[in-house]
């Protein structure tokens, strides 16, 4: 009987300690891993093809992409990024590669909001990134707001935070 009471007490304490907020993107609970801030951008052609997929004509490889910012002294510094492949979860399938960077989001959160993205031989584009907490809230490219990928209420949180650039 004592074992049953102890097990119930432990379950009660764990249940109280691990309550998650209903708001998606809310803070981590006591048991979950801490989430990092990130920046994610898909790049598409005017006809909707993935320009980060090397198999598509006119696409850019990671070597053809430069992401950088100017520090307080005006020195250009590169920003680490990766190309994430398409993904699928039980609720969502996303068929596009994404330019992904934790570093860009951390720098933007610390106060420097202006970055530059150079794709192949194109002119560098100015990115103005607004980060609030652990979410990239807004992206302007050359002073034009870039929309988030269309998502529904049941979609994964990550999908709801991918910006979609059409060239």
What are these regions (language model features)?
Residues 2-7, 11-38:
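Bacterial Sec-dependent N-terminal signal peptides
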Residues 36, 109-114, 122, 136:
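Extracellular Ig-like/FN3 beta-sandwich strand-entry sites
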Residues 21-25, 45-48, 92-103:
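Charged, amphipathic alpha-helical segments
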Residues 123-167:
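Glycine-rich, aromatic-bearing surface loops/beta-hairpins
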Residues 47-50, 72-74, 122, 143:
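Detector for glycine-centered tight turns/loop "hinges" at secondary-structure junctions
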Residues 28, 43-58:
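Short amphipathic, basic-aromatic surface patches that mediate peripheral association
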Residues 54-119:
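Tryptophan-paired
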């Amino acid at each position: 009987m004592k074992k049953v009471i102890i097990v119930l007490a432990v379950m009660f304490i764990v249940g109280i300690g691990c309550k998650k907020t209903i708001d998606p993107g809310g803070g981590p609970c006591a048991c979950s891993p801490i989430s990092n801030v990130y920046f994610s951008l898909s790049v598409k052609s005017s006809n909707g093809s993935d320009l980060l997929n090397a198999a598509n004509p006119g696409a850019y490889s990671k070597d053809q992409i430069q992401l950088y910012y100017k520090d307080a002294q005006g020195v250009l510094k590169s920003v680490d990024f990766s190309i994430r492949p398409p993904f699928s979860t039980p609720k969502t399938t996303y068929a596009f590669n994404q330019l992904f960077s934790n570093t860009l989001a951390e720098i933007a959160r610390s106060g420097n909001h202006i970055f530059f993205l150079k794709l192949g031989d194109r002119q560098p584009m100015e990115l103005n990134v607004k980060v609030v907490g652990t979410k990239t809230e807004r992206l302007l490219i050359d002073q034009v707001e870039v929309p988030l990928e269309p998502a529904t209420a049941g979609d994964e949180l990550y999908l709801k935070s991918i910006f979609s650039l059409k060239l």
